[in-house]
Amino acid sequence: MSVSALSSDRQIENLIVRYSHLGDEGNLAEFGALFDEADFVFGELTLRGGKAIEDLIGSTLVVHEDGTPRTRHITTNILIEVDETNGSAVARSSYNILQTAPDLLPLQVVGGGRYSDRFVRRNDAWHFARREVTIDFTGDTRFHLKGQQSA
């Protein structure tokens, strides 16, 4: 099935989920490319373009020997509102980040929060226009974020 054959809701949901998969796989180049023509907002920081986001994530996340951050982003409560006439959409969702590492057992939640997204349709496909990431909860991030202190 081609992308254009999918409903707008489904295409947008796929983008939301692709973000999680690419991050969990450690594929930072494709992760950043999701925002080639989009804003990525994290607290007071706003970045635009794939390379800027790739560089930010690469300088922030711990990548383990297997080439991944050893995480699973679980995105839930996805609420999508599409304006087909204007080729725009908004979405809200919640996320939890699970992680395990040799020195971080058992599997645990290291963070959780919300995504607030805007999308635009270009060339019959949906793309991120803006993602705002809010962190509501954090756990033991020593093996997830660079520069964290040992417990």
Predicted regions and their residues:
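Beta-strand elements of well-folded, non-transmembrane domains
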Residues: Y95-Q99, F119-R121
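Short beta-strand segments enriched in hydrophobic/aromatic residues
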Residues: G23, F35-D36, Y95-I97, E132-I135
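A solvent-exposed, acidic/Ser-Thr-rich amphipathic alpha-helical stretch
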Residues: L28-N96
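Extended, polar beta-sheet/loop recognition surfaces of beta-rich domains
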Residues: T141-A151
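Short, cysteine-centered beta-strand-loop-beta hairpins and adjacent loop/turn segments enriched
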Residues: L98-Q108, T138-G139
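Short, low-complexity N-terminal intrinsically disordered segments enriched in polar/charged residues
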Residues: M1-A33
